[in-house]
């Protein structure tokens, strides 16, 4: 097979090695636009896991890399005069130029031809080839030539960074967070060779502008940063090598192959340098592509197999890198954190490293974090917390007004569609009661509608008829009598998403018969097939507001501990907040302040009735749709809601419009809770694809939320909290009839 590889970086050279080694009959040529002896940058980072992957693919390359690498276990975080050191991380640093030289040497020894100063713009420029590999980096000319097929998307991030070196040999992967008159600077530093370290400096655009630095003034940059980091450099110099100020591009492509052309490495995807994964991804791409090509399938089929196998892992790492880069872009919001919590937050910023992962690496640090968090929880709740043993974060108390939860796990509202004219029944008793027995600190009812016309379906729960109070009281009294859990009720009006069938009979489809009229902020149907709502008049607003107040009064009579008002997911109050669903021309439309006017009126009215007990509000922090609510809007919505009388914000996202395109993934909504909690400075609950105790503990210890809300996990396992306690070695006593469970040892089925 004739293979043309465009780009003599780690991706292209390593692929050439693997292809030529596995089949010496392949004719493999590598084209490089620059001179082969040129090189830029300083060191690159590999985890031990990556080194092991490389070792399995080509032991000879791995041996050469290991001999050239510097190794370290520790991470140091310098923040507000404090230094936190974490161990057990196992990294290696290699000089980039050395890496390229050893890869090129290995490739040539196998018979690969490497040609420098050859700019390849189109596949035809390579000459006859059965396979063309575009490994020509972020600014790939081949990718751009075939952009209509690859569908590239480049997201240029906001922070500025410069890649420098230094003669100071850092003994650990070191992060500085350095304030200056211009603003806050972040530094990523690590050793890659004796007496040589990478020194990446990053700052917000406004900080960089205030410093007076210029993009391409290397000498000015070095002089400024040597002065700024004089103490940290300990008399050592900074080194420049094409060290210009840049912004990082996150590269994604709709597809990675077209005909006999395939994207590899940075041409296909990038991951922010804060997770140290660019070269890792490049070399692992090469391993995956070589494996696919070895199958003997026709090239187009092999390329499709490569993309199918490789894309999920890459996209997962890109999500982690996105979380990490957004953390570094927003470090300013964490400046008030305790240095220990700041360090924990930084170490877990990508959402891939959890409380449990970190405990296995560095048990002493996590024990210190847990002890600190337990003390904080005791102070916040006014309840003593035993430190022998120290409880995991999820098993610490939390106070909302006079309500004290015994732990931080919340059963999320989950519609059951089993009520009759709003009356809940035995199904709801078992559903809520079993989760309360299961150990959660707070159980919240399904969306409970404040009027008959406010239901999603005929099977929705209600709080609008006198008889509803007794039906709900039966459940509330059971929870209070038999468990330590508290119970809240979520009050709502479905708005334009009402009068539909249960999801299993047709999601969002109108009823076949018996539809009722709908209300919304504006007369816009949720789907073209849905009923068009009537735009609410002031009289409608009064009636619905009073229905919320009446439902709050009835909830008090039923004995609920907390009310959650539903301002999310495209239901009635949500339609006022989102610009996508609010097209009003009066004082309730237009600016966010105007759009919030009616939801805030409802919050204030419910607060006046509910008086001393806590109120939560569930919001959609973003709409996941162009022109809709963005993350900064979510911060303001939360701030206004708490100012109007809410005590905590249950942070969700989306659901507002049918055309939304959520970016799903593990903990996908937690970053919104994190931002709201620190920028609006309000308590938050986070929800969305949280499944493990490790994730929940991480969220809490890092300060990303105050309570952790789980839905599907509680459907799968009503006793999720008790099983988490067992997993973590924490003793959570069972109710007396179940006390024998303490002596039971579960075994794999």
Regions found by a protein language model. Give the residues of each.
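C-terminal helical "tail/cap" subdomain of flavin- and related membrane-associated enzymes
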Residues: 291-382
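Glycine-rich, N-terminal phosphate-binding loop of Rossmann-like dinucleotide-binding domains
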Residues: 135-137, 271-272, 414, 712
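Glycine-rich FAD cofactor-binding loop and adjacent beta-loop-alpha segment at the N-terminus
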Residues: 1-4, 8-72, 78, 87-98, ...
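Residue-level marker for buried hydrophobic side chains located in beta-strands
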Residues: 29, 261-263, 443, 708
